[in-house]
Design a protein with these regions (language model features):
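Bacterial N-terminal signal peptides that target proteins for export
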Residues: 2-11
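Bacterial N-terminal signal peptides
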Residues: 11-21
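Electrostatic cytochrome c docking/interface patches
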Residues: 23-46, 137-146
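Short glycine/proline- and charge-enriched loop/turn segments
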Residues: 27-30, 70-78
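Periplasmic/extracellular electron-transfer cofactor-ligation site
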Residues: 37-39, 44-74, 99-107, 130-137
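Sequence context surrounding c-type heme c attachment/ligation sites in exported
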Residues: 41-52, 88-94, 117, 140
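Axial heme c-ligation environment in periplasmic c-type cytochrome domains
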Residues: 68, 77-78, 96-130, 139-143
Length: 146
């Protein structure tokens, strides 16, 4: 049985397509940054479980983080925008979390076998959400999204 295509049928199809188009949109970003609110929420939980013991609950780092310790390593730096994390592009931040800080003179273990790429991006989104707008913009200006 063939149904005639009427203006009403076409209108219903177009309306259905328009409504479905909105279903595939991605989540909004946080203040125009590269990450979403859900990434920050996931990252906050992951940070608490994997990073806060050394870097502090608010990613504030340790005192004298720029001074070489007696063991020959640097203490955990702040990741909240007050340290040097913003000097590194996203790829470099991911690599540091995957490989750890030992190659750079620190003692942080690598998390490549424990955290997925999505987990690592969520961690970064959490501590970057602590960065003031001026710090985030300076990071972008340095090519942070490379």
């Amino acid at each position: 049985m063939n149904m005639p295509i009427t203006n009403r049928t076409v209108a219903a199809l177009l309306l259905s397509m328009a409504l479905l188009t909105g279903c595939g949109e991605t989540e909004a970003t946080v203040d125009g940054r590269w990450y979403s609110p859900s990434q920050v929420a996931t990252g906050k939980a992951l940070f608490a479980d994997n990073c806060a013991e050394c870097h502090g609950a608010s990613a504030q780092g340790t005192q004298n983080w720029q001074t070489l310790g007696a063991d020959g390593t640097y203490p955990p730096p702040p990741l909240n925008g007050l340290g040097h994390a913003w000097h590194h592009p996203l790829k470099g931040l991911k690599r540091s979390i995957q490989q750890g800080g030992v190659p750079l003179g620190g003692s942080m273990p690598g998390f490549a076998g424990q955290l997925s790429d999505a987990d690592i991006e969520a961690l970064i989104s959490f501590f970057q959400s602590q960065w003031p707008t001026t710090t985030y913009q300076a990071w972008l200006d340095r090519g942070g999204l490379r």
